[in-house]
A protein has these predicted regions:
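N-terminal cap/leader regions of alpha/beta-hydrolase-fold enzymes
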Residues: 1-244
């Protein structure tokens, strides 16, 4: 296995975005691609590591730059300043997501007929909005994602959706989970929700502990959600991944 990584520039109109590409050069044939939608901190090392993990599974991993310019905000105010406009204008967000999706499908190592997306926190919302917006995904997986629907009507989708959710997440109350289930059913999705008890926001991020119970790493929920992820990707990609 020879995993190679490199930055990949793409455009959303005049906005330059810098994705992070990871793939195994050992096998020359085009492979399924898993897009990684970053959390509110931007396309950081965590998102890049997830892309590398996808490459290790035999897929192409492509971490999107949904803020543009590879912005990596550090303070809460700076993170909100970048995330807020996209969260408030979901049409703008979908346009940005479509640009990243298109860029990935044009990569020579990618089989554009086998696309999936995963996302964390804000990236979970991005992943769900890809499904809502009708992007051609085989699978879409949200980890402790924001679940609220956009104002615009969602499109029908054949994507298989997995929502990995901490039941005590203050950013996605139980009623929002129920609402999402109804929404995905109306869209025609094959969907599943894995809700983890005694689990809050950011449960996949090692070292996270806000001290007030709102954000905390949970190794059991992290492991269980990752196993569910590998299972779903294996289901939709079959033997198209090297190690699937």
């Amino acid at each position: 296995m020879t995993i190679t990584t490199k930055p990949v520039e793409y455009k959303d109109g005049k906005q330059t975005c810098v994705g992070f590409l990871a793939w195994d050069e050992t096998y020359a044939d085009p492979k399924p691609c898993v897009l990684v939608n970053h959390a509110w901190g931007g396309r950081d090392g965590f998102a890049e590591e997830k892309a590398i993990q996808m490459a290790a599974l035999g897929y192409v991993g492509f971490a999107l730059d949904n803020y543009g310019d590879h912005a990596l905000p550090e303070s809460v105010d700076d993170k909100m300043a970048l995330m807020g406009p996209l969260k408030e204008d979901r049409k703008l967000l979908l346009k940005r997501l479509k640009a990243g999706f298109k860029a990935a499908t044009e990569l020579e190592m990618v089989d554009e007929t086998y696309m999936a997306a995963i996302g964390y926190c804000f990236g979970g919302l991005c992943t769900l909005d890809m499904v809502r917006g009708g992007l051609d995904l085989k699978a879409a997986i949200s980890f402790h994602g924001l679940l609220d629907a956009p104002e615009q009507k969602s499109k029908k989708s054949k994507a298989k959706v997995l929502v990995a959710h901490g039941w005590d997440d203050p950013m996605a109350k139980p009623e929002s989970v129920v609402a999402l289930g109804g929404e995905l059913t109306a869209m025609g999705c094959d969907w599943q929700v894995h809700a983890y008890g005694k689990t809050t926001h950011a449960f996949t991020v090692p070292g996270t502990d806000s001290g007030d119970g709102t954000l905390k790493f949970n190794p059991d929920a992290e492991r269980r959600s990752w196993l569910a992820t590998m299972d779903l990707l294996g289901e939709v990609f079959g033997d198209h991944g090297i190690n699937a």
